[in-house]
Amino acid sequence: MNTSPRKLNLDEWDGRYEQLRRDGLREPGYGGPLRRHVVREKDFRLQQLQFDSSPAALRLWNFLLTENERLQRARANGDKIVGTMKDLGTVPVMAYALPGVRAFYPDGAWWTPCLMECSDKLLQQAEAMGIDASFCPVRAMLPAFETGEHFPKPDLLVCSTGAVCDDFSAIAQRLEHLGHSIFWWEIPRRRQPAAGETGCALPGDLAAPKIQVDCVRAELLRVGQALGELAGKTLDDGRLAAGIRAANQARRLLDTLRRTVYSAPAAPLPALEMLVAEMLAIHFCSDREETVAVLEDLLAEVQSRVRQNQFVIGTDAVRIFWVNPVADLRAMNLLEELGGRICGSDYMFTHALDLIPENLPPLEALACTALADPMVGPTADRAARIVRECQAGRAEAVVVSRIPGASHCAREGEIILEIVRREIGIPAIELEIPPVCDAMLATLGSRLQALVEIARAGRTK
């Protein structure tokens, strides 16, 4: 059997798995063949995807797709379950600083219609509950709470408000109206310090007035008190500092993985696995220690491939910077099929990739990190970081994937594209990708193919 790095469909992974087993594959308790997720969980979309062929990628996918089992097992063992919504990376750091607490994002249900190819009927159920297709696919979260089939009911539900997208805010309020108690905390819209106003440096080369940092710190103090009451332990500075250091361990690994993959002469790991790996930073897929182990495996695989000049995408592939997560994972495969490769990304949570400052009081450090969220500040700030990372990654083109119905996507894509074109002059497009994009594959393919060809033609000028 060919063991060089490559992409495999699900049928090919069946054979690959049996070969790995014969060769002595050692797996964690959640391991097993990928196909079982189709049979048991009805994750039919896996049958349409291409996967990396490494045992490290197998571990990554099994880790992602067994989160509900992990949460159910944690509850059975007496752990407290915290549902955190919208902040994408801040509250989980606090939750995991306490013993016996697990955090997850109910927002993650937005990928369920994709994975189950809408057989779950979550989007239709959301529409029956008054949240129709004019809202972001995160509306799938609403019926998921009601059915209890996709994640356990949290012991504590925490949601950020203030500088959040309108459709998510409306969905969360509807959720509370249905009887799900929510602990709200507020984050203001980030702005630059005014003349003469004391400012604070934030991760990601950003800044905010000290008054905003103080405001968020006070809100996170309230969150910490609620988490402590749930756990029966005080979330003091010592615990919080240790939690920050542990979170930064995962973030450092991910940073090294991203730099190694995106700077390599060709792609040593496919775009789809990189997207999933980056998602782990948000809440550690409900297991912080295992997230570190999964990332260590991926990094070791990638470093080995780079040393041996083994890649899954050829050196001629056009270097693409991708903005926003895709509602349909199939789109990441499609880009590579058409001659592109990812050389950089902004999947809406860059603040969850940046290191949390360890030289500040813990709550202040987390407040600064929360305010660095690209979605709570001006789009121009986000675009400036995209431009810097495009230049660092030698991007030849930019794709902004618009999320259907998402209120934050109404104008931000246009603004980002305008700034990218003005500052670095590379081709850039905006695409809307629905949860299942099969009906649009031809159109999406044509637009991506044109972008790749234009970028490739630009090499000869």
Task: Annotate the PLM regions.
Residues R6, E12, E414-K461:
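Peripheral docking tails and interdomain loops at the edges
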Residues F151-G238, A242, A246-T256:
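Internal, well-ordered alpha/beta segment that forms a basic, Gly-enriched binding/recognition surface
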Residues W61-H150, D155-L156, A163, D167-A172:
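An N-terminal, globular interaction/scaffold subdomain
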Residues G377-I424:
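C-terminal hydrophobic structural anchor segments
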Residues A76-G78, D87-G89, Y96-A126, W322-V387, ...:
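Redox- and metal-dependent alpha/beta enzyme cores, enriched for Fe-S-associated oxidoreductases
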Residues G83-P92, T161-F168, F321-L329, P404-R411, ...:
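Gly/Ser/Thr-rich loops at beta-strand to alpha-helix junctions
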Residues N2-K80, V213-F349, L353-D354:
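A charged, amphipathic alpha-helical module
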Residues Y96-G100, A172-G179, N333-L338, I415-G425, ...:
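Short, surface-exposed basic-aromatic patches at helix termini and helix-loop junctions that form
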